[in-house]
Design a protein with these regions (language model features):
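Cytochrome P450 heme-thiolate "Cys pocket" and heme-binding signature region
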Residues: 70, 230, 235, 271-278, ...
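N-terminal membrane-proximal hinge/A-helix region immediately C-terminal to the signal-anchor transmembrane segment
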Residues: 1-70, 85-97, 117, 129-134, ...
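Cytochrome P450 catalytic-core helices
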Residues: 239-264, 371-387
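Cytochrome P450 proximal C-terminal region
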Residues: 5, 95, 143-147, 266-268, ...
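Conserved cytochrome P450 K-helix/beta-meander segment immediately N-terminal to the heme-binding cysteine loop
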Residues: 306, 324-350, 431-432
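Cytochrome P450 heme-thiolate monooxygenase catalytic core
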Residues: 43-51, 67, 83-242, 260, ...
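Cytochrome P450 I-helix active-site segment
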Residues: 88-92, 139-145, 200-207, 250-297, ...
Length: 434
């Protein structure tokens, strides 16, 4: 991708069959024109067809127009404001529960452990589930699905539906369909039970969706509910776990960064409120820089043009796919001097426009869980750094690898837990008690 930019400039084209052109954009001014253009000029949902086998036709990611806007407004509230903050203590407790089981003085892969935390958090947010047989089954099935879809073959399988078919006992297509069928059974069973015994006092997302009515007074169908729940389960934990793992790596790879963060955390009161933690400037800067240097998604969700359009001096024809490239913009030396260097201070020195820094996409397709993901990142990092003495098991640099549509650290980042800090000396210890 970077070599193409160096060779062809800030707008280059790839061919994706049937005469369709896929344009990668990395000029912030051009990206601003795309993200501020009338959304009606694009088929953004149709551009995400490779997600259909997992999230279904009724997913927010595949919708356009009024229906997309209606679903977006419905799903936004739980991930913002007071509803989001209500999950703060849960995040700290779940982090402590998982980390307390880590082996002492022997290496372990961090990423799978952080994914346990993120999946538990999203199961609570979406279903209100923290334990029980269904919760355990969903954890196991989601783990199996991610192993299938984030493998190299799984990435190829997403682009070629013929590979998703069942060709026998050893075919990946059979295993994929089996796992999806089992997940669907769990989701539909939960929907039926909750619809039958509806409890409006519950605050989870499924309750909100069950109570929702469209302009004609009709509730969402079971299939619509299933597709939105599946979208939230997939998008709501794997990406966040990857971002947190990258942050843990950088903090422990660079001693000066870790020392500065620990000093900032130590400045908190003995029993701070969660708002004080998430407002810490250097902690914020670490999270922002983590999402800059290796953004979880390399591009925004692409947009298919419905009409001819001239943008930034370029003429684009209908059916062209436009993809603002997050990674290439975040690596521009004119915006970020020494872009391959992890330096959180750059976010304390200046502000960047939403077309210069956009790890969660932009416009009406911006990730609805962006605020929640950052909230979770900060609280997980603060809990781990104040509760545990951790070191990297290996000093060599960790390189990024493609994990499905995300960019993850190769090897999952090996850590060694040396022990726990004294609970008396840790400022957020009281939030981690079960």
């Amino acid at each position: 991708m970077r070599s193409c930019q160096h060779r062809y400039g800030d707008c280059f084209r790839a061919e994706f069959g049937a005469g369709r052109h896929f344009y990668f954009l990395s000029d912030p001014k051009v990206i601003e024109q795309v993200l501020t253009a009338n959304p009606a000029n694009f088929d953004s949902g149709r551009a995400n067809w490779i997600l259909r086998p997992t999230v279904g036709d009724n997913s927010l990611l595949l919708l356009d127009g009024d229906r997309h806007q209606r679903h977006r407004q419905l799903l936004m509230p739980p991930f913002h404001g007071e509803r989001m903050k209500a999950y703060g203590e849960l995040i700290c407790r779940l982090t402590e529960q998982v980390a307390s089981q880590w082996p002492l003085n022997q290496p372990f892969a961090t990423r799978p452990e952080i994914q346990k935390i993120s999946l538990s958090i999203i199961l609570q947010a979406v279903f209100g589930l923290t334990e029980g047989p269904r919760c355990d089954r969903l954890r196991s099935l989601m783990d199996a699905l991610l192993k299938l879809t984030t493998s190299r073959f799984g990435f190829v399988m997403a682009f070629f539906p013929i590979l998703q078919r069942d060709y026998g006992a050893w075919s990946p297509g059979r295993r994929f369909n089996q796992v999806m069928h089992q997940i669907d059974e769990e989701l539909y069973a939960e929907i039926r039970e909750r619809r039958h015994a509806f409890d409006p006092t519950r605050s989870d997302i499924l309750t909100l969706l069950l109570a929702a009515r469209d302009e004609t007074g009709q509730p969402m169908t079971d299939v619509e509910l299933r597709d939105e729940l599946m979208t939230l389960l997939l998008a709501g934990h794997e990406t966040t776990a990857t971002a947190i793992t990258w942050a843990i790596y950088w903090i422990h790879y660079l001693p000066a960064v870790k020392a500065k963060l620990l000093t900032e955390l130590a400045s908190l009161e003995k029993q701070p409120d969660l708002g004080a933690i998430v407002r810490l400037p250097y902690l914020n800067a670490i999270c922002y820089e983590t999402l800059r240097i290796y953004p979880i998604a390399l591009i925004t969700l692409p947009r298919i043009l419905k009409v001819p359009m001239e943008i930034g001096g370029y003429q684009f024809e209908p059916e062209s796919l436009l993809a603002p490239c997050i990674y290439l913009v975040h690596q521009r030396p004119d915006l970020y001097p020494e872009p391959t260097t992890f330096r959180p201070e750059r976010f304390l020195e200046r502000q960047f426009s939403p077309y210069e820094y956009f790890p969660f996409g932009g416009s009406n397709r911006r990730c609805i869980g962006a605020a929640f993901a950052l909230y979770e990142m900060k609280l997980v990092l603060a809990t781990l750094l104040t509760r545990y003495e951790l070191t990297l098991a290996e000093t060599k640099p960790v390189v990024p690898i493609r994990r499905g549509v995300t960019t993850a650290p190769k090897g999952g980042v090996k850590l060694i837990a040396k022990g726990q800090h004294s609970a008396v000396s840790t400022p957020i210890a009281s939030l981690c008690q079960t």
